[in-house]
């Protein structure tokens, strides 16, 4: 005699808007909801191209939403200085269209590319703690598995890089972060870059030429060049 059929729902790829998995982050968002009630003020979902997830060959993973960027707009990297650098590069190499200088991603459409963050909620002072990074892996893991045609992952910053390596079941020591470094894991090519934050760009840790070279490399991979 067989038991009842148990149907297990697939893991969620995006947290609910009222997620309270990380108390410090949910409290921080609650404060933003009071200050700016018309903003997104919640976990930021993965941004897909207009053609949907089956068109995605490249996934870009950043650190976390910016307070006045993605936390306001609800789309990763949109509305802040890091988005200005990212979308300019994606547009130059055929991975996005519609970028206008100074728009910080407003009005952009992605091409064959999805964008997400290792931590989905805006953290105080843009600094998530280890427990929050680990908790949000519950969404990063199914996001990495979501795209049937995914070929490459571009990680922006060491935290995003390490989170992706762990989410794919790898050891960080075997796949260390380095600007422009590439490593293979679970059938994917992981490409790393310093984060395109205003601080990194202003201090010269990351120049436009350095960032453009990495985007050109990953574009060549997913576009078959």
Residue ranges: model-predicted function:
Residues 3-224:
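A polyanion-binding, active-site-adjacent surface
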